[in-house]
């Protein structure tokens, strides 16, 4: 069984890195990464930069991406532009893309990684809470993709990788909001792959499973997630890590996947095949509510 690559829990760069791919795989490309200031998005930015790519990392929190950009540039020697941007606001997206194009003159890759999630029964989920997740995950993915298509990809081609989930593959308790949003993004991936393929634009999804060192796992799995029977009973019997997910995204974004479009690559150690759907846990959330 292949051993996972080394990773670190927090939003810090790897102390050492061994290239599994050619070090100049993305030499002088530019990647625009939403949600790039933390978690999976941060590690994607780092791995891309370790393969020669410059990055733009965008998040609502400017202090977060400023700190992240300093770490990333210091560890990799590549350029990283931090931008404050709310994916739900098309004017903010347009301004951010314009700034990125002014800085680099091009954008070759878009990684849609901004997302929101929490546990809540459907009957206790406020209308606004459901809408908020749909706005960030689904509308946000379309907004950034649409703006980049108009401003650069339509005339120059490009690659889009949408970070989704396996929640929509079957019914999952406490996740109607995130499952619906991510399933919609997977459908969007297929539609855009069909429409934009003739402009030399590839569009794919990457669906991670439970990943250590992420805010998502802390919210959904708790501090003992790695010891959960759900994890130990999954095919690979462990959590994934952020570097593994970044490697999968690197493949999809690179020339290695030049004939891959409209696909959903699941990188979850087979977890969705064996994880229970959470119905037995519903009584524990009987008095729970979410009113964002």
Swiss-Prot record:
GO molecular function ontology, one term from the record: trans-2-enoyl-CoA reductase (NADPH) activity
Enzyme class, broadest EC rank: oxidoreductase
GO cellular component entries: cytosol; peroxisomal membrane; peroxisome
Gene Ontology biological process terms, A to Z: fatty acid beta-oxidation using acyl-CoA oxidase; fatty acid metabolic process; unsaturated fatty acid biosynthetic process
Binding site for NADP(+): 35-40, 60-64, 86, 182, 208-214
Residue window of motif Microbody targeting signal: 290-292
Positions with a binding annotation for substrate: 60, 88, 118, 126-128, 219
Name of a matching Pfam family: adh_short_C2
Residues carrying Phosphoserine: 287
Subcellular localization(s) per the UniProt record: Peroxisome
Modification N6-acetyllysine occurs at: 151, 291
InterPro entries reported for this sequence: DECR2-like, NAD(P)-bd_dom_sf, SDR_fam
Disulfide bonds: none
Catalytic activity: a (2E,4Z)-dienoyl-CoA + NADPH + H(+) = a 4,5-saturated-(3E)-enoyl-CoA + NADP(+); a (2E,4E)-dienoyl-CoA + NADPH + H(+) = a 4,5-saturated-(3E)-enoyl-CoA + NADP(+); (2E,4Z,7Z,10Z,13Z,16Z,19Z)-docosaheptaenoyl-CoA + NADPH + H(+) = (3E,7Z,10Z,13Z,16Z,19Z)-docosahexaenoyl-CoA + NADP(+)
Domain of life the protein comes from: Eukaryota
Positions of modified residues (N-acetylalanine): 2
Subunit record text: Monomer, dimer and oligomer.
PANTHER family: PEROXISOMAL 2,4-DIENOYL-COA REDUCTASE, PEROXISOMAL 2,4-DIENOYL-COA REDUCTASE [(3E)-ENOYL-COA-PRODUCING]
Protein's UniProt name: Peroxisomal 2,4-dienoyl-CoA reductase [(3E)-enoyl-CoA-producing]
Organism of provenance: Homo sapiens (Human)
Name of the gene: DECR2
């Amino acid at each position: 069984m292949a051993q996972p690559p080394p990773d670190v829990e927090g939003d810090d760069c790897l102390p050492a890195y061994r290239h599994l791919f050619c070090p100049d795989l993305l030499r002088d490309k530019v990647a625009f990464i939403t949600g790039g200031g933390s978690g999976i998005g941060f590690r994607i930015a780092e791995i891309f930069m370790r393969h020669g790519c410059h990055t733009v990392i965008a998040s609502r929190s400017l202090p977060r991406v400023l700190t992240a950009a300093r770490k990333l540039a210091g560890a990799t020697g590549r350029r990283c532009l931090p931008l404050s941007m709310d994916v739900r606001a098309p004017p903010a997206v347009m301004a951010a893309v314009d700034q990125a194009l002014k800085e680099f003159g091009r954008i070759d890759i878009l990684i849609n990684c901004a997302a929101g999630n929490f546990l809540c029964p459907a009957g206790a989920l406020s209308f606004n809470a459901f809408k908020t997740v749909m706005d960030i995950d689904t509308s946000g993915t379309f907004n950034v993709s649409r703006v980049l298509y108009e401003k650069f990809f339509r005339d120059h081609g490009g690659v889009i990788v949408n970070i989704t989930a396996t929640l929509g593959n079957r019914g999952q308790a406490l996740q109607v909001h995130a499952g619906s949003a991510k399933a919609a993004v997977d459908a969007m991936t297929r539609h855009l792959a069909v429409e934009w393929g003739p402009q030399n634009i590839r569009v794919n999804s990457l669906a991670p499973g439970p990943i250590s060192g992420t805010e998502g796992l802390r919210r959904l799995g708790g501090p003992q997630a790695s010891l959960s029977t759900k994890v130990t009973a999954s095919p690979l019997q462990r959590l994934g890590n952020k570097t593994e997910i970044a490697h999968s995204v690197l493949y999809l974004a690179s020339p290695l996947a030049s004939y891959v479009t409209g696909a959903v690559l699941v990188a979850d150690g087979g977890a969705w095949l064996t994880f229970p759907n959470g119905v037995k846990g519903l009584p524990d959330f009987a008095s729970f509510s979410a009113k964002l």
